[in-house]
Amino acid sequence: MNYQKIRPLIHNQIKEFISDTNNLDIAAYFSQGPIHIIFPDIFQENIHKFLSFYKLNWLNDNIYFAHKTNKSHCFLEVALNNNISIDVASKNELIHSLSTGFTWKNISCSWPKSQDFLFLAMKHKCLISIDNIDELKSIIDIYSSGNFPEVEILIRINDLSSSDRIVSSKNTKFWISQHLLPEIYNLLYENKFLNFKWLHFHFDEHQFELKAGSLQNAIDILQQSYELWFAPNIIDIWWGLRGNELLDISDWKKYIDFLAETKKNNWDTHTWWNSAYWVHVSQKWVIEWREIVEKRFRELDPIEFLNNILNFQTHSWNIWDTLIDSMFDLMIEPGYSLTLWCGFTLLKVIGYKDLWNQNSAVIVNANILNLSSKMWKYFVDPIHIQHKKNNNNTHWEFYWYIFWNLCRDDDILMQKKVYFKNKPEIWDYILFMNTSSYISDFEDGSAISQETWIKLIAKKDNNNTFKIYPD
C-alpha cells in the first residue's frame, strides 16, 4: 500500500510526557473511558506569545480567550492569572467564568443570546456583543424592567469591504449588516444607557491582506461614528486562526495528491466506503473539492499573521500607524491558537476485527462523539504505544481502520486507514494529538451509557516530575 502518513506537530513537553509509559499508565487508571490530558504550562506559554506581541507593539492587552474552545476549568484559571480576558458564548459559560473570578471588566458575551443570558450579563455589567437588532431591542426591554447599570455594547458587522481591493465576508447567519447601522444609531440615541464602545467583525479568512482590508473598513466605520457623536475606541477582529498542527505541511499536500490520483484512476483510496474525504472526479474528469479539503491544514504562525495585518499598507500608511494615530485599541478572541498543542486524548485498544477484502480494524474505548467528529474531521495519524512490548510482529506492517464502540456503522473517527508498525493489542494505547482545541469536549456525550470522558491535568512540580490530577 502506498501510504502517506500525516504526522502531528507535538510540543516538547508532551513528547517528554508520553515517552514515559508510566505517565500513561497512571492516567489510564483514572477512567475506563476516553481520557483527555491537558498541559496548562503550554497554554500559558501560548498566552505569553500574544501578550509579548501586544507589549512590543504598544497595544493594550485586549486578548479574550474563547471559552467555547475547551471547557477546562484549569484553562480559565490560567487565563485569569495571566490577566487576559474571556469571551463566553452561553449563560453557563458566563456562570463558569464568574465563578472562576472573572468580572465585568474582562468578560465579553457573544453569539445569539437567550433572555436569561442577557439578563445575567447586564446584571454583571459585562460587555455584550450585539448579534442582531432584535437582541439590542431585548436589552432595551430588559433594562426598562429593572434596576440595571449602563450597558456596554459591541456591534458585530458581517459585510466589511475595502476601497482598494475586493473584500467581502461570506454569507452568515450571525451579526449585522452595515446598512442597518443607521437604525442601530437611532436606538443608541434614544437609549442613553447603551454605551457603544466597540466594533467587531467576524471574517474567517486566512489571507492577511483581506483581513487587513476588513480592518481598515472597520476603522473607517469608527471614524464615521465620531461624526455622529459616538466614541467607540476598540476594534475586535475576532481571530479564527488555528496555527501549525502538522510536523510537516507537505504530509498533507502529498496525501491530497494521493487522493486525487487514486480517484482519477478509479483506484482504492483506502478510505471508508472509498469516500476520499469528498475529493471526487466530476463528469468532465475534473478533480473537485480538492481546494476545499486542502484548507483544513495551513502553514501559519498566528503571531506572524497578526504582525502582517498590522504592517499592511492601506491608504498609503500601515494599519498599526492608523490604530495608534486614531487612539484605537485592537481586540482579538483567540481560542484555537491559544489551546493548540496543549493536550492529547488517550484511548485504549479493546479489540480488533477482520473485514471484507482483507481489511481489518482496531476497536478502541471511545466513539465519534468523544472527539467531536461532527465538528472536525480527524486526519492526523495517531500514535500507537504498546502496553507490553511484543517483538513477534515487528516485521509486519498494519494498515487498519479505527473503529469505535458505538452501535452505528458510521462510528469511525478517521475515514482513512492508519499505519501501525506493530499490531495493536488489547490494552495498548492509541494517542490522538492536539485535541485540546474544539475536539476533546466540544460535543462530547455518553451515547448508550458508555463511559464518558475524563479530563486530566499534567503539570511538572518543583522536582521537574509530572503530576497528574483531575481538572
Residue ranges of each PLM-predicted region?
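Conserved, mostly hydrophobic/aromatic
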Residues: 43, 68, 90, 121, ...
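A charged N-terminal "starter" segment
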Residues: 1-143, 147-151, 186, 191, ...
